[in-house]
A protein has these predicted regions:
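Regulatory N- and C-terminal appendages and interdomain linkers associated
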Residues: 1-51, 63-64, 187-191
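Conserved ATP-binding subdomain of kinase catalytic cores across diverse folds
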Residues: 33-141, 165, 169-170
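Generic detector of well-ordered alpha-helical packing
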Residues: 71, 136, 177, 195-197
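AlphaC helix of the protein kinase catalytic domain
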Residues: 142-151
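Conserved alphaE helix
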Residues: 155-163
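Catalytic-loop of the protein kinase fold
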Residues: 172-179
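Catalytic activation segment of kinase domains across protein kinase-like and atypical kinase folds
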Residues: 180-197
Length: 197
């Protein structure tokens, strides 16, 4: 569901939300949707965890759900100049909405990815800033953490290969696949995250 809820100070705020959130009463949608992205309020909660990385990721809980808030930032040299603004004419100007839709599609195909909850775009005259909130995959650790603690089992290696092949079979190519966005749990189940490129 797409909802454009506010236009002020030459900026337009648009949300893409999962169906369960679209049932919020119209007069309270704007504040409710915005609360998912209120970093100051979220960080005041003692249970919130701030993660390192370019995306400024926060792990938090809301409405009895464990969630991940990620702010989209640029990388590379250009990212040092512009940081988190994407020009509206760029190919990747709508990363948050693109990732949201891709996650929904992959879930419909039974692929092991997190569920998208809500995404936001704030548009100015020529640029857009973006955020996304997804459900946290509890019990999973990224591969870089796991291999820093122990060796992988043969079964885990096999499961990683099989999981990646599922995405290839659906013609989905993760352009930044690395050990930080391959997750594994204690049962050896594998999931893939960060489809923002």
């Amino acid at each position: 569901v797409v909802a454009t809820l506010s236009k002020e100070q030459f900026k337009e705020v648009t949300y893409l939300v999962e169906s369960t959130l679209s049932g919020v009463q119209q007069n309270s949608k704007s504040n409710y949707y915005a609360s998912f992205f209120d970093r100051d309020s979220i960080q005041q909660d003692s249970k919130t965890i701030s993660c390192s990385g370019r995306g400024q990721t926060l792990l938090f809980s809301k409405d009895r759900r464990d969630l991940v808030l990620r702010h989209y930032r640029r990388g590379g040299f250009f990212g040092k100049l512009v940081k988190d603004s994407f020009f509206i004419f760029e190919k990747n100007a709508h990363r948050a909405f693109d990732e949201f839709k891709l996650l929904e599609y992959m879930l419909s195909k039974g692929l092991p990815v997190p569920k998208p909850v809500i995404a936001r775009e704030i548009k100015g005259f020529f640029s857009v800033t973006q955020d996304i909130v997804i459900e946290r995959l509890n019990g999973y650790k990224d591969l870089s953490y796991v291999i820093s603690k122990r060796e992988l089992t043969e079964t885990e290696y096999t499961n990683i290969g099989k999981t990646i092949s599922l995405f290839f079979k659906e013609n989905i190519l993760h352009t930044d696949l690395n050990i930080r966005n391959i997750l594994i749990n204690e049962e050896g189940r594998v999931a893939i995250i960060d489809f923002d490129k």
